[in-house]
Curated annotation (Swiss-Prot):
It is an enzyme of class 2 (transferase). It comes from Brassica juncea. This is Cysteine synthase. It comes from the Eukaryota. Keywords: Acetylation, Amino-acid biosynthesis, Cysteine biosynthesis, Cytoplasm, Phosphoprotein, Pyridoxal phosphate, Transferase. Its EC number is 2.5.1.47. One of its GO terms (cellular component) is cytoplasm. Homodimer.
């Protein structure tokens, strides 16, 4: 009998489960299932690209453990995906990140031995990218993975996420709903799904406050991980059938409801994906259709954010009962 023990943590990436949404989907004429990427080894969809970008660079002979210094700007979860892979493979990693990202993300990155550089939150991801490029210019053996431009990002979703969803739904998926950060998930998984069935519709989700894919202007919002304020080069915009806008408040409310009504503790971007998918599943023309929404990350990573403000205050003010 073959051993089922993984040779290292990177072999645990992928094959995340799908689950129907029930109680939050009242009034829907279509069905909504969630792809639970918080079940990855480090609790987010970015575990896939962290591994794929490092492995791809290794295969091309661009980096070597113990020699190369990996550098990446990230809003957090890609950093974590890179960090555990770098730790397992023996790389030094420098991460630049806007100071507005949750404290949990900082702690996790530091726990993996990352050198963390915080950047001006007012400058968003552009500020983090500029700082990473500055560090790269003065770092011997430095290598930037460039998640927003790296073809290894959508490639891993084409090779794994898309096939997993197709197989998991027995090919019965009608719509794929994904928040757009780098655009890697919707581009890679979406391309695979459309190759299997050209009638599958792809729905991108972006913050209403920073709706650049819809022709709006970039702006501040609270949905960490999506709505970077620019159109990434790995995003194939032409693949997308419709962009659905959701507000930060709507996303936060839905993330809270998912915990209370579905038993799913998820991050704000999962709330955004769920809110968008439910809107689509309520349209009369979508009766009987199956929508799969990507839930990118686990809620525990957001305990210090606005998502859990009221809960945190309640927990902190509690006293013991005699």
């Amino acid at each position: 009998m073959a051993s089922r023990i993984a040779k290292d943590v990177t072999e645990l990436i992928g094959n995340t489960p799908l689950v129907y949404l029930n109680n939050v989907a009242e009034g829907c004429v279509g069905r909504v299932a969630a792809k639970l990427e918080m079940m990855e080894p480090c609790s987010s969809v970015k575990d896939r690209i962290g591994f794929s970008m490092i492995s791809d660079a290794e295969q091309k002979g661009l980096i070597k453990p113990g020699e190369s210094v990996l550098i990446e700007p990230t809003s957090g979860n890609t950093g974590v995906g890179l960090a555990f892979t770098a730790a397992a493979k023996g790389y030094k990693l420098i991460i630049t990140m806007p100071a507005s990202m949750s404290v949990e993300r900082r702690i996790i990155l530091l726990a993996f031995g990352v050198e963390l550089v915080l950047t001006d939150p007012a400058k968003g991801m552009k500020g983090a990218i500029a700082k990473a490029e500055e560090i790269l210019a003065k770092t011997p053996n430095g290598y930037m993975l460039q998640q927003f431009e790296n073809p290894a990002n959508p490639k891993i979703h084409y090779e794994t996420t898309g096939p997993e969803i197709w197989k998991g739904t027995d090919g019965k998926i009608d719509g794929f709903v994904s928040g757009i950060g780098t655009g890697g998930t919707i581009t890679g998984a979406g391309k695979y799904l459309k190759e299997q069935n050209p009638n599958v519709k792809l729905y991108g989700v972006e913050p209403i406050e920073s709706a650049i894919l819809s022709g709006g202007k970039p702006g501040p919002h609270k949905i960490q991980g999506i709505g970077a304020g620019f159109i990434p080069s790995v995003l194939e915009v032409d693949l997308i059938d419709e962009v659905v806008q959701v507000s930060s408040d709507e996303s936060i409310d839905m993330a809270r409801l998912l915990a209370l009504k579905e038993g799913l503790l998820v991050g704000i971007s999962s709330g955004a994906a769920a809110a968008a998918a439910i809107k689509l599943a309520k349209r009369p023309e979508n009766a009987g259709k199956l929508f799969v929404a990507v839930f990118p990350s686990f809620g525990e990573r957001y305990l210090s954010t606005v998502l859990f403000d009221a809960t945190r205050k309640e927990a902190e003010s509690m006293t013991f009962q005699a």
